[in-house]
Amino acid sequence: MSNVTTPWWKQWDPSEVTLADKTPDDVWKTCVLQGVYFGGNEYNGNLGARISSVFVILFVSTFFTMFPLISTKVKRLRIPLYVYLFAKYFGSGVIVATAFIHLMDPAYGAIGGTTCVGQTGNWGLYSWCPAIMLTSLTFTFLTDLFSSVWVERKYGLSHDHTHDEIKDTVVRNTAAVSSENDNENGTANGSHDTKNGVEYYEDSDATSMDVVQSFQAQFYAFLILEFGVIFHSVMIGLNLGSVGDEFSSLYPVLVFHQSFEGLGIGARLSAIEFPRSKRWWPWALCVAYGLTTPICVAIGLGVRTRYVSGSYTALVISGVLDAISAGILLYTGLVELLARDFIFNPQRTKDLRELSFNVICTLFGAGIMALIGKWA
């Protein structure tokens, strides 16, 4: 004898209920119209394309995340400074747009006050969606504050870095010719080279105590950013593996989505000067980001005939994760990236051409990511 209990909301037949009926109530009608009640699995085949998405997203996400690292840390490579600046500030715009368009809006769409979840049970007693975002943002702020205080008290070093200091880090990290070739050409490590009117910056092994000490604060701030993005990537992967007719349009859009997010993460990661004993950490963090979505796509494929993305439980999980990630990325994008790079950067007015370039790159990244939000 089966012990399965029939859900209470199945006592009414949607085909026999009109919007004017007083019974069942409006919340039940909302849940039916939104597909939460009586919704089903949307999987419609395309297994080959779905399997390919695992490997395509794995390669693209990992490559774009590692590209800034490869460009600045692998010896014998030279890149113009403006290529690095483009990746860095384009990524800043991507992070900010992701917080608003790809996290905040879906969170409200899953557990907001006008949704099925937001009107039922304890979810209907309070505006939990913005409360979760506020809690996440506050936790991120406190983590940033305490880590900064700890670093300053222990090392006497401020978390803030001027634009020139960041540029110096790029100069130190940007790999060029080996020291042997430098000696042969009569140049010193870390020298500034100009060819054909394009500026290049060469590698040097930075061993100053300031760089080693600043690693702590920079790394903690970066971890917060990556965790926020990874939380977001979990539900993206699950949905891509099991979504229905939307798969054909969602697949290419998510490839671009993961690429741009990866570029933003990699650009920020490449500006951190890791101690020699931890030189493998940035590569591991790039791989962690690159693996998250493909693994979740594979999990989605494993449950493709049973997973219902519009179910009550799935909406609660995705809504909470999106709200948490939105709070993290809102603080990181607006404070750690935009405010510190532009508003509180005392060097910003020294080169107005570079400042204009950085602003344009930021707006371009935000605009592209906002456009992608139309489909994903």
UniProtKB/Swiss-Prot annotation:
InterPro entries: ZIP (IPR003689), Zn/Fe_permease_fun/pln (IPR004698). Residues 72-80, 144-216, 264-278, 332-354 are cytoplasmic. Residues 177-196 are annotated as: Disordered. Keywords: Ion transport, Membrane, Transmembrane, Transmembrane helix, Transport, Zinc, Zinc transport. The chain crosses the membrane at residues 51-71, 81-101, 123-143, 217-237, 243-263, 279-299, 311-331, 355-375. Signal peptide: none annotated. GO terms for cellular component: cell periphery; endoplasmic reticulum; plasma membrane. Its main location: membrane. Induction: Induced in activity >100-fold in response to zinc-limiting growth conditions. Not expressed in zinc-replete cells. Residues 177-191 have a biased composition (Polar residues). One of its GO terms (biological process) is zinc ion import across plasma membrane. It is found in: Membrane. Residues 1-50, 102-122, 238-242, 300-310, 376 are extracellular. It is a multi-pass membrane protein. GO terms for molecular function: high-affinity zinc transmembrane transporter activity. Inhibited by Cu(2+) and Fe(3+) ions. High-affinity zinc transport protein. Belongs to the ZIP transporter (TC 2.A.5) family. This is Zinc-regulated transporter 1.
